[in-house]
Amino acid sequence: MRKIYFRADASATIGYGHFIRTLALADMLKDDFDCTFFTCHPTSYQVEEMEKVCPFIPLQEETHSADFLSYLQGDEIVVLDNYFFTTDYQRAIKQKGCRLVCIDDMHDKHYVADVVINHGITNGNLFSTEPYTQLCLGYAWALLRLPFLQLPQIQRKNRKIEKAIVC
């Protein structure tokens, strides 16, 4: 089975969106791929959530970049989601022979990734990419957890709102 390594960090104060959407993608793909999640200093909540989806490997803050690269054999797909992963770091992953997917909502750096996912309504011309980079832009690419993916299947009664107070 093909391997996918997911790399995202979060703390008690920042980054949970990156962690949650990347874990949502792992959950979508876990039946068809051998998924492993890599993160720095996971909280007990993160550990609990990752254990529901796939194996995980905690990384040390001081050496996380080099440590993650040391796991790569070159046959993996790597998914990065963090503002701090630079173009040089992307290049290091690509030089290992891996396919690379970057989840982005800033478009503030050059991408050497094979695929860039941005679920916002974004102009592709705002991205600096390699000629081979495929851009996956717009709501169709939103990485949602299973409960939110199932919402459209729930029957709703249309109720007419007759009175409303706006403050």
Model regions: which residues?
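Short helix-loop-beta junction
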Residues: D31-D32
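Extreme N-terminal starter segment of soluble prokaryotic enzymes
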Residues: M1-Y5
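Conserved beta-strand positions in the Rossmann-like core of class I SAM-dependent methyltransferases
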Residues: T36
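Active-site and donor-binding regions of nucleotide-sugar-utilizing enzymes
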Residues: R7, S11-Y16, R21-M28, T39-P131, ...
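A nucleotide-sugar donor-handling region in carbohydrate enzymes
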Residues: A113-C167
